[in-house]
């Protein structure tokens, strides 16, 4: 952001920039420098580990920290039991970690640290990151499906009661819709987070332009934009939680297909 010139590039915030090892850190021609994206993912992982560790005291009368961790765990446990059944409990560690990792990453990217010279990076606004998370979930679905049901897993793509002549038509349609799942799962989170951050950055450019243009233009454009920024920021906090929940929810539904073939 360049306040002096009043220019704000809304896409600049998504740039992946090397922090360590920008030169000579290559494997098979690919640069493996430690980037801002990796740094914020590492920070998210550390904070998540501290959050969980702090809530594992197992006190008979739990403190606020322990209650918070147990509340999130119970929330995920209940969701999996509703969507999968008793068999869903064994997936609590994964889905809980997935949900919290996305939630922490979304929220960290909203922190107003720019005033301190620190520029938060929302790694969930990159399709490569959300894509990897979706592929991991999809891989678990495939492993569970074939491990538990073998080739009978393919019966998932033929709904019960389908007339025999319709199977050659229904099967490829169901298979394609199944294979598209990781793409749609990743795209949903990526678009939601990216759109919100772009909107906030555009509004911030209006505020800066209003300040630089003088009091009159500032009151006419800058002040309403600033108020709108506050409202959008509050909405983005809500979206951060909703998108983490949706990702975890859809993952649980996909695992249910692998576990129960429906």
UniProtKB/Swiss-Prot annotation:
User: Which GO cellular component does the record give, naming just one?
Assistant: plasma membrane
Q: Which domain of life is it from?
A: Bacteria
- Entry keywords, A to Z: ATP synthesis, Cell inner membrane, Cell membrane, CF(0), Hydrogen ion transport, Ion transport, Membrane, Transmembrane, Transmembrane helix, Transport
Membrane topology is: Multi-pass membrane protein
Where is the protein situated, by its record's location annotation?
Cell inner membrane
Q: Recorded GO terms, molecular function?
A: proton-transporting ATP synthase activity, rotational mechanism
According to the record, the segments passing through the membrane are 32-52, 98-118, 127-147, 153-173, 189-209, 219-239
Q: Could you tell me which Gene3D superfamilies the record lists for this protein?
A: ATP synthase, F0 complex, subunit A (1.20.120.220)
* Subunit architecture: F-type ATPases have 2 components, CF(1) - the catalytic core - and CF(0) - the membrane proton channel. CF(1) has five subunits: alpha(3), beta(3), gamma(1), delta(1), epsilon(1). CF(0) has four main subunits: a, b, b' and c.
Per its database record, what is this protein's job? Answer: Key component of the proton channel; it plays a direct role in the translocation of protons across the membrane.
* Family to which the UniProt record says this protein belongs: Belongs to the ATPase A chain family.
Q: What is this protein called?
A: ATP synthase subunit a
Chain's gene name: atpB
């Amino acid at each position: 952001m360049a306040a002096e010139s009043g220019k704000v590039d809304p896409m600049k915030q998504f740039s992946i920039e090397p922090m360590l090892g920008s030169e000579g850190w290559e494997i098979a021609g690919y640069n493996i420098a430690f980037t801002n994206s990796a740094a914020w993912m590492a920070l998210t992982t550390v904070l998540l580990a501290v959050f969980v560790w702090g809530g594992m005291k197992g006190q008979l009368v739990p403190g606020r920290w322990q209650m918070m961790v147990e509340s999130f765990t119970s929330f995920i446990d209940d969701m999996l039991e509703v969507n999968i059944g008793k068999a869903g409990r064994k997936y609590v560690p994964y889905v809980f970690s997935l949900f919290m990792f996305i939630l922490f990453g979304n929220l960290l990217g909203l922190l107003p640290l720019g005033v301190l010279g620190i520029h938060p990076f929302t790694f969930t606004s990159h399709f490569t990151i959300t894509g990897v998370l979706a592929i991991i979930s999809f891989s678990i679905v495939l492993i569970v499906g074939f491990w538990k049901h073998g080739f009978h897993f393919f019966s998932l793509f033929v709904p019960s009661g389908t007339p025999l002549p319709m199977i050659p038509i229904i099967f490829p349609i169901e298979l394609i819709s199944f294979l598209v799942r990781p793409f749609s799962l990743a795209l949903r989170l990526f678009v939601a987070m990216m759109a919100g951050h772009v909107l906030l950055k555009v509004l911030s450019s209006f505020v800066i332009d209003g300040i630089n243009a003088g009091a009159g233009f500032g009151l006419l454009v800058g002040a309403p934009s600033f108020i709108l920024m506050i409202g959008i920021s509050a909405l983005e906090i809500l979206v951060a939680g909703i998108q983490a929940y949706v990702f975890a929810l859809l993952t649980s539904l996909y695992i249910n297909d692998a576990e129960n073939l429906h």
